[in-house]
Amino acid sequence: MSVKWSELYRWAVIEVEFGTPKKYVEIPHDCVDLMGKYPYGINTDNEFSMRHMAIVISKNLTNSSITVVPLTETKHGDTENPARVILEHQKYKYFLYKDTTILVDNIMTIEKKVRIKRIVLQWVPEPIRRKIKKAMYESFK
């Protein structure tokens, strides 16, 4: 299913293909086209990888690239990090499958027509937006 770009808004929750972790890459012995085999790129050890949800924070969505904050499963220590916003599954189960952390400190720009696979939710609720803005302010002040 293709993405309807007219339905992409700031604060939308999207599904993004972030790339293949280096540890999953089979180094070819011949001249195999790596971009053909790994179209979303090969990530180093600490780069965000695989398919994850993200929240669009760009204001100008007509650009080919947009800025997002990725979401991932909540891990031990996330609550102590001021650059992380924790979302409880029980409160947001209409779009989350488990407790989730917004990685505000992993803000990144992506090529929207290549990386975005689908729009999950057209916009997140205002309380989540406020938490993201506060975490951004605390992280980058």
Language model features: what each stretch is:
Residues 10-11:
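Loop/turn positions that initiate beta-strands
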Residues 40-92:
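Compact nucleic-acid interaction/catalytic patches
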Residues 1-6, 80-141:
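C-terminal terminal-subdomain/extension
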